[in-house]
């Protein structure tokens, strides 16, 4: 398991800023939460993203939320949804590598 809290996930364009939370009890699975469109101000700190992550954590799931490229401390530039698909895959790969049986 990966240490929980703020972290950076290596990405082809540099890194993705992320927050990983694990429940206090044995977890039942993992979840990835993505934020709204960044050109509209979306970040992983959006209240809907935060509350969704909190709800998933309360339900016993590991919750990973992250900033897409060019948002917050994530590197790269906005790519009109093309590169952002790679960001989702990178975050999913991170979860698969660190929680292989989930």
Describe the predicted segments one by one.
Residues 1-7:
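A domain-start/cap signature at the N-terminus of enzymes
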Residues 10:
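Pyridoxal 5′-phosphate
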Residues 1, 13-15:
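Short amphipathic alpha-helical surface micro-motifs
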Residues 15-101:
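Serine-hydrolase catalytic machinery in alpha/beta-hydrolase-like enzymes
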């Amino acid at each position: 398991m990966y240490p929980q809290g703020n972290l950076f996930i290596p990405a082809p364009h540099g890194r993705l800023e992320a927050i990983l939370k694990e429940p206090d009890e044995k977890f039942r699975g993992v979840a990835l939460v993505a934020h709204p469109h960044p050109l509209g101000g979306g970040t992983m700190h959006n209240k809907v993203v935060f509350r969704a992550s909190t709800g998933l954590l309360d339900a016993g799931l590991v919750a990973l939320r992250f900033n897409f490229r060019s948002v917050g401390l994530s590197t790269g530039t906005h790519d009109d949804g093309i590169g952002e698909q790679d960001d989702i895959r990178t975050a999913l790969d991170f979860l698969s590598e660190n929680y292989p049986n989930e």
